[in-house]
Amino acid sequence: MTEEMKFFLFLIERYAQFKGRPTGEVLREWDRKGITQEIYDGYWQYHQEAIQNAYMDIDSLTATGRHAFS
């Protein structure tokens, strides 16, 4: 398993916990909105920052389809 995949799994589990939602539900929402790959590709940004920054960016992607920190 790649470091990117390990981090993605960590991120989605922590994000789901932060939101009080099941992980599968979060993944289905990301898939439905077409942002799963975008979040996965955010590894190089997300793993270097506070996890709360990743949450803010994911919330922005979910709501608007755009990154919070563009």
Regions found by a protein language model. Name each.
Residues 1-25:
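N-terminal acidic leader/helix
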Residues 18, 33-36, 61-68:
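Generic N-terminal helix/loop capping motif
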Residues 43-70:
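Long, compositionally biased
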Residues 9, 24-27, 40, 52-59:
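Generic detector of well-ordered alpha-helical segments enriched in charged/polar residues
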Residues 5, 13, 41-44, 53:
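Intrinsically disordered, low-complexity segments enriched in small/polar residues
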Residues 17, 23-46:
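Amphipathic, hydrophobic secondary-structure cores in small proteins
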Residues 12-14, 30, 64:
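Low-complexity, intrinsically disordered/propeptide-like segments
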Residues 13, 21, 36, 49-52, ...:
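A generic structural signal for solvent-exposed, polar alpha-helical segments
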